[in-house]
Curated annotation (Swiss-Prot):
It is an enzyme of class 6 (ligase). It catalyses: L-glutamyl-tRNA(Gln) + L-glutamine + ATP + H2O = L-glutaminyl-tRNA(Gln) + L-glutamate + ADP + phosphate + H(+); L-aspartyl-tRNA(Asn) + L-glutamine + ATP + H2O = L-asparaginyl-tRNA(Asn) + L-glutamate + ADP + phosphate + 2 H(+). Heterotrimer of A, B and C subunits. The gene is gatC. Allows the formation of correctly charged Asn-tRNA(Asn) or Gln-tRNA(Gln) through the transamidation of misacylated Asp-tRNA(Asn) or Glu-tRNA(Gln) in organisms which lack either or both of asparaginyl-tRNA or glutaminyl-tRNA synthetases. The reaction takes place in the presence of glutamine and ATP through an activated phospho-Asp-tRNA(Asn) or phospho-Glu-tRNA(Gln). This is Aspartyl/glutamyl-tRNA(Asn/Gln) amidotransferase subunit C. It comes from Nitratidesulfovibrio vulgaris (strain ATCC 29579 / DSM 644 / CCUG 34227 / NCIMB 8303 / VKM B-1760 / Hildenborough).
Length: 94
């Protein structure tokens, strides 16, 4: 599937990425290769294949959730460059 540089530029703009022309061209080719591969996978006949959610037959082994208090709030806030009461102060992003 052919992806244009304009489509890649739109994706980059939405992702807040600044890409030069060379990268737009390279990524257009890479996206096209990925979509071609997805088309090839979609064409595989899976009629007699039983659905599964994991290639492993073993269930997930999880540990029990246990609450551990390692540090007090004051100890954590003492490591912060800036705090306000019980909150970390971080730079504004938007």
């Amino acid at each position: 599937m052919k992806i244009s540089k304009e489509q890649v530029a739109t994706i980059a703009r939405l992702a807040r990425l600044d890409l030069d022309e060379a990268r737009l061209e390279r990524f257009a080719g890479q996206f096209g290769d990925i979509l071609d591969y997805m088309d090839m996978l979609g064409a595989v006949d899976t009629t007699d294949v039983e659905p599964l959610y994991s290639p492993s037959e073993h269930g997930t082994v999880l540990r029990a959730d246990e609450v551990h208090t390692h540090c007090t709030r004051e100890e954590l806030l003492a490591n912060a460059p800036e705090s306000d009461g019980q909150f970390f102060v971080v730079p504004r992003i938007v």
